[in-house]
Swiss-Prot record:
CDD domains reported in the protein's UniProt record: cytochrome_b_C, Cytochrome_b_N
More about this protein: Heme 1 (or BL or b562) is low-potential and absorbs at about 562 nm, and heme 2 (or BH or b566) is high-potential and absorbs at about 566 nm.
Annotated binding of heme b b566, by residue: 97, 196
BP term (GO), one: mitochondrial electron transport, ubiquinol to cytochrome c
Record-given protein name: Cytochrome b
InterPro entries, per the entry: Cyt_b/b6_C, Cyt_b/b6_C_sf, Cyt_b/b6_N, Cytb/b6-like_sf, Cytochrome_b, Cytochrome_b_C_euk/bac, Cytochrome_b_N_euk/bac, Di-haem_cyt_TM
Transmembrane segments: 33-53, 77-98, 113-133, 178-198, 226-246, 288-308, 320-340, 347-367
One Gene Ontology MF term: ubiquinol-cytochrome-c reductase activity
Length: 379
């Protein structure tokens, strides 16, 4: 008799995706982050669901409802901090996942890569709207500053901002709609992640060498299920340590002050995972130019497959490209640091130089270096 997992319509899909899936025999721990992102998404949806049971999306009671969750709801503090720090873990995994894709040439799977870029935008939008919900000082002013950027769009900018606000400033209507969108978007992200996997399983996974691995495939279960479980355990260890020992490490103290439209915080800044993009935005003195640079800092990922000039897929055997990749990583860390600093000398010039270097590396230096490596190998 044929095994049920190979005949049952539902089990067949699960079987071909997680059990009998042929996987390259040499994929390293850098390939663990896809499953970790799935776990992060599940954690965020579950904790978010329980938070939504007690949260009220009204400007008068939003801040109090979050305080109520932390003080009066059974394990409410745990759920709240798991959700807040879960977002940080989500972005750490996201950045490492994208970095892996860049290093090993996974972007050559065009459909998978483009869905991934779309997912990145969706997760960033969700995180931004989630940050507004506690209605602290940084929530309110962050929402005001970021939504105001849309006013830089010619002709329709001002109308667009007022349409998003639902009035003439960030107020009750804004908070209510942000809560609605923040609730629905994770489910859209889950659906997109399904499409992401669908496209990936059409081509099969890439591997560190960047070479075709069809001649040497192994079943996903038990080899990579065990490997993924180890990754998940490490993720849970890091997340619980963060939540139980220093839950406010990655947050902003200003958000423990209720939102006050009459009092501007000295330094308005987003959560740490947006600081690199915020630094690029601030490095351009022109409003529209800054907004374009902000969008392009993420959208540039979609262009990378078309700038691949090397005859090798992976950077594993390309030392010059490796150097540029790690310079790019250092540059992004520099931008993250600059994004959290006040707008004054020397931070302004450092931010501008780091922003120029970011685009220069991706759009110019990396493609030229790849051509040089081809030439050195006489290809």
């Amino acid at each position: 008799m044929t095994n049920l997992r190979k005949t049952h319509p539902l089990m067949k899909i699960i079987n071909s995706s997680f059990i009998d899936l042929p996987a390259p025999s040499n994929i390293s721990s850098w390939w663990n982050f896809g499953s970790l992102l799935g776990v992060c998404l599940i954690v965020q949806i579950l904790t978010g669901l329980f938070l939504a049971m007690h949260y009220t999306s009204d400007t008068m009671t939003a801040f109090s409802s979050v305080t109520h969750i932390c003080r009066d709801v059974n394990y409410g503090w745990l759920i709240r901090y798991l959700h807040a720090n879960g977002a940080s873990m989500f972005f750490i995994c996201l950045f490492l996942h994208v970095g892996r894709g860049l290093y090993y040439g996974s972007y050559m799977f065009l459909e998978t890569w483009n869905i991934g870029v779309l997912l990145l935008f969706a997760v960033m939008a969700t995180a931004f709207m989630g940050y507004v919900l506690p209605w602290g000082q940084m929530s309110f002013w962050g929402a005001t500053v970021i939504t105001n950027l849309l006013s830089a769009i010619p002709y329709i900018g001002s109308d667009l901002v007022e349409w998003i606000w639902g009035g003439f400033s960030v107020d009750k209507a804004t908070l209510t709609r942000f809560f609605a969108f923040h609730f629905i978007l994770p489910f859209i992200i889950a659906a997109l992640a399904g499409v992401h996997l669908l496209f990936l399983h059409e081509t099969g996974s890439n591997n560190p060498s960047g070479l075709c691995s069809d001649a040497d495939k192994i079943p996903f279960h038990p080899y990579y299920t065990i490997k993924d479980i180890l990754g998940v355990l490490l993720l849970i260890l890091v997340l619980t340590s963060l939540v139980l020992f220093s839950p406010d490490l990655l947050g902003d103290p200003d958000n423990y002050t209720p939102a006050n439209p009459l009092n501007t915080p000295p330094h308005i800044k987003p959560e740490w995972y947006f600081l690199f993009a915020y630094a690029i935005l601030r490095s351009i003195p022109n409003k529209l130019g800054g907004v374009l640079a902000l969008v392009l800092s993420i959208l540039v990922l979609a262009v990378i497959p078309f700038l691949h000039t090397s005859k090798q897929r992976s950077m594993m055997f390309r030392p010059f490209s490796q150097c540029l990749f790690w310079i790019l990583v250092a540059d992004l860390l520099t931008l993250t640091w600059i994004g959290g600093q006040p707008v004054e000398h020397p931070f302004i010039i450092i931010g501008q130089l780091a922003s120029i270097l970011y685009f220069l590396l991706i759009l110019v230096l990396m493609p030229i270096t790849s051509l040089l490596e081809n030439h050195l190998l006489k290809w």
